[in-house]
């Protein structure tokens, strides 16, 4: 187990930047924007796992890219819509966006979560709700899942 290499892997493959190294992944995290993919991958890297994350955005159809990947390594994330909208509003503020943007609107978050659920259902993968759970708790669930 080389934690430094796992961190480098997580950073290099964050947010679906590239799929060149996906065959080296121990775990593939899917989810809407701001659902906790990146911090989860970094924590999994601290455990020595090569973790890649792929954002699910309805306007960017990733299904053809991910449908043939190893489903036993895939984890789908869902986050409570109101909580996710709140997090996105904070992100908007950090970016200097005032008012309600489409990105942070509750309607958009519901739409993205529904899209993610459809993808997870088509793939038949393990899904975890992030709501009210720590990164450590979710990581522990993932590690147990991967070991079975």
Regions found by a protein language model. Give the residues of each.
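Hydrophobic/aromatic beta-strand patches that form the interior of the parallel beta-sheet core
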Residues: 52-54, 73-77, 126-128
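Internal active-site segments that recognize and position negatively charged phosphoryl groups
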Residues: 4-50
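A glycine- and Lys/Arg-enriched "phosphate-lid" helix/loop adjacent to the NTP-binding pocket
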Residues: 73-111
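Terminal helix/beta-alpha structural elements that buttress the NAD(P)+-binding lobe
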Residues: 55-56, 126, 133, 144-148
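Conserved nucleotide-binding/hydrolysis micro-motifs of P-loop NTPases
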Residues: 58-60, 80-84, 134-135
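Short beta-strand-centered segment that lines the nucleotide-binding/catalytic pocket of NTP-utilizing
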Residues: 51-62
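Small-molecule kinase domains that catalyze NTP-dependent phosphoryl transfer to phosphate-bearing small molecules
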Residues: 4, 10-14, 97-138
